[in-house]
Amino acid sequence: MSTDEILQKVLADTFADVTFSGGDPMFQPEGFTELAHAIKQRSRKNIWCYTGYTFESLLRNPRQAKLLEYIDVLVDGKFRQELRDEDLYFRGSRNQRLIDVQASLKANKTVSYRYNPGI
């Protein structure tokens, strides 16, 4: 499936945002960067990304850091069974973080995403 075909499917659903996950999107940063850039140009959708990498390691890799420019929320870190916690929102283990990527890039430090379930 081409990037344009995926983009058309994403844009056809006006209510859903976008999640990049499984496998690991950071294994194919160029393709996901192309798709994320197109989504941001043509919609107001939020993009979440799940990765086994840490935010800090992604920043050190120029190809992966480029993708971060289009990501709104990053769930970083490998799932660790011994840290599993079913009470966490949007992640499976306590070592994984929810990161507000755009705020982090602006502040030049890691900024946690604050989920508000009441909204």
Question: PLM features: what roles do these ranges have?
Answer:
Residues M1-L67:
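Conserved Radical SAM active-site core
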